[in-house]
Each structure stands twice: as C-alpha cells, then as structure tokens.
C-alpha cells in the first residue's frame, strides 16, 4: 500500500509530504481514474422492485484495487524468477504454472454472501467484493489472458482499455 492513493502521500521517512512531481501525480491520476471507472461500472446487485441496482464504488476501494493489481504482478514476477534455475514446472492436472497461479488467486477470494451483506459491504468496505477482486483485477493483466488463451468474450477487456498502475 506504500504506493496506492493514500500511501503515495508519505515520503521515505513516513512523513506526509508531497514528494511527487506534478507530472507523476497527473499520470497517476489518469491511470487511477480509469481503474475507478472500471470498478464503478460493476453491478454488485441487480435492481429489485423499486430498489435501483447497486454498483461497486471504485473510489472507495481504489487503494485496495491498486494493491491487488500490484501484488499480483509482483508475485507473478517472483514466480517466474523462481523458474530461472530449474525451469518452469510441468503442467499439473492439465494446468500450466501460470494457470495454477491465477486459479490460486481466484480461489482465495471465493465467498458465499447474502445480498444484504453485499449491499452493506459495498457502501462501507474499502475492499472490493471477492468476485470483483478477481474478475476486475485480472481483466487488466495481459499475462492472465495469455495463460488461458483468452481472445474475446464477456469478461474480455480490449488492450487499449486496460490499465496498469505500477
């Protein structure tokens, strides 16, 4: 979280200090605005009766969404660095190392949750719902598409619409 929307406001000594150049801050805002809008478009609960649909709050969850994306990218790099000496392991149960990496990430965030709790968490929790931590995050990561040979489909996000914060 040291380089998310909150952590970036602190310098190397932990003091709140605007240490970024104006250009860096502007570029960060452009990228994070895209991520906020991606999450804002996620319907977490459909309209029901006279109740409108409930949408994810990309601004509320921005720091965590940045951390999820950054953590995935760093851990993926670490995984591949571990292959340098011994090579990439053989597929297991038909899944490559990259596929198992992303399947493991998705498995972590599985939830069984009631609609009332989804509505509450969407309004107060800085973390995106588990489903969105997986689907919305992975949509921006090229190596995910490569791992599964994804070229189009409902969850496909065209390359020009993807955003990588770090």
Predicted regions and their residues:
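Zinc-dependent metallohydrolase catalytic domains
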Residues: 1-166
């Amino acid at each position: 979280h040291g380089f998310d929307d909150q952590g970036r406001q602190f310098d190397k000594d932990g003091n709140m200090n605007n240490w970024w150049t104006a250009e860096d801050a502007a570029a960060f805002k452009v990228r994070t605005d895209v991520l906020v809008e991606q999450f804002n478009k996620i319907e977490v609960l459909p309209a029901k009766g006279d109740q409108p649909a409930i949408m994810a709050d990309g601004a509320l969850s921005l720091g965590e969404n940045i951390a999820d994306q950054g953590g995935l990218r760093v851990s993926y790099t670490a995984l591949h660095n571990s292959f340098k000496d011994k090579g990439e392991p053989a597929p297991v149960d038909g899944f490559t190392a990259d596929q198992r990496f992303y399947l493991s990430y998705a498995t972590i965030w599985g939830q069984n949750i009631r609609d009332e709790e989804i509505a509450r968490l969407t309004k107060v929790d800085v973390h995106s719902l588990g489903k969105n931590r997986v689907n919305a995050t992975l949509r921006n990561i090229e190596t995910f598409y490569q791992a599964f040979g994804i070229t189009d489909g409902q969850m496909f996000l065209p390359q020009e619409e993807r955003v990588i914060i770090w």
